[in-house]
Amino acid sequence: MDFEDYNSTYEDSYTDDFDTIVALEEFSPLEGRVVRIFLVVVYSIICFLGILGNGLVIVIATFKMKKTVNTVWFLNLAVADFLFNVFLPIHIAYAAMDYHWVFGTAMCKISNFLLIHNMYTSVFLLTVISFDRCISVLLPVWSQNHRSIRLAYMACVVIWVLAFFLSSPSLVFRDTAHLHGKISCFNNFSLSATSSSSWPTHPQMDTVGFGRQMVVTITRFLCGFLVPVLIISACYFTIVYKLRRNRLAKTKKPFKIIVTIIITFFLCWCPYHTLYLLELHHRAMPGSVFSLGVPLATAIAIANSCMNPILYVFMGQDFKKFKVALFSRLVNALSEDTGHSSYPSHRSFTKMSSMNERETSML
């Protein structure tokens, strides 16, 4: 994702999307500094929690647990989030240096590519996990006979390759240019030449460039948000219906977990994608909508990368009965269910569930 994309000017020289200098015409120097400090602090916290939490999940899933389908999902999700957070310091430095890019054009392309790739990988993995759990409930016998670690790894390979393909525009359009004495890393959809004394043409003044911007933006919205949300929602509501029909859910907790998963995913990514769609018609919107909204929306979206380990531990748990060690909770959250029920593989259907198998039926 474009972490610096909240930083553009909204005038005739407007660049390809939210890039470079934090809305100079919208912010006073003091306001701009406050926004930069806010982003540096928030991104730093997310980076620290993301590297620590996902690193712990990677270690546990790799060295402390038996390989199962669930651990394959969780390991890949943690790796994607970990890589996402490893490259956050570059963008933290970019904001701290008043949006002066000193890392070169190649790193401008690569860092943004990796961030977009992580967005797609995480979303696709969450979707596959939801579909996998839905199949385990609807077709338990088939799932037991065909659900294998090899198939899970194959699915992960497809996900990473597909994410690579969808993220490749960053390698093509990401560019650097000079503006107001600073070097900016931005999306040059028009592919116009840049120099120390010039700035790329606004994409709406270049039909081809604006068309490329529309394709990239709409593709990200459809493939990175809308379609996954619809699939995840359909899977979880199907699970709820099946459980209630078979009276397997004895409490309302499973339904709360499902609703929370959907709402969390939706709230994290909806503002980000909404603002990018609005950006296509930014001239009809007040500049403050983007200069203030995009930093907040971006922070919320990237926070998703550090939330998963926390949700593994606490989702569906009663904090008043917090007696189990953190390490044990992570292991339980990542473990393949081995209990006995009509739908044995369904008890751990969510990557965020961590309940005691002796006492509770996990989703």
Curated annotation (Swiss-Prot):
GO terms for cellular component: plasma membrane. Disulfide bonds join 108-185. Receptor for the chemoattractant adipokine chemerin/RARRES2 and for the omega-3 fatty acid derived molecule resolvin E1. Interaction with RARRES2 initiates activation of G proteins G(i)/G(o) and beta-arrestin pathways inducing cellular responses via second messenger pathways such as intracellular calcium mobilization, phosphorylation of MAP kinases MAPK1/MAPK3 (ERK1/2), TYRO3, MAPK14/P38MAPK and PI3K leading to multifunctional effects, like, reduction of immune responses, enhancing of adipogenesis and angionesis. The modification Phosphothreonine is found at residue 338. It comes from Sus scrofa (Pig). Gene3D superfamilies: Rhodopsin 7-helix transmembrane proteins (1.20.1070.10). Its main location: membrane. Residues 61-71, 131-152, 242-256, 305-363 are cytoplasmic. Glycans are attached at residues 7, 188. This is Chemerin-like receptor 1. The modification Phosphoserine is found at residues 335, 345, 348, 354. One of its GO terms (biological process) is negative regulation of interleukin-12 production. Residues 1-39, 93-109, 174-220, 278-283 are extracellular. The chain crosses the membrane at residues 40-60, 72-92, 110-130, 153-173, 221-241, 257-277, 284-304. It is a multi-pass membrane protein. Residues 337-363 are annotated as: Disordered. Residues 340-355 have a biased composition (Polar residues). SUPFAM superfamilies: Family A G protein-coupled receptor-like. One of its GO terms (molecular function) is G protein-coupled receptor activity. Belongs to the chemokine-like receptor (CMKLR) family. Predominantly expressed in spleen and temperately in adipose tissue. Keywords: Cell membrane, Disulfide bond, G-protein coupled receptor, Glycoprotein, Membrane, Phosphoprotein, Receptor, Transducer, Transmembrane, Transmembrane helix. It comes from the Eukaryota. It is found in: Cell membrane.
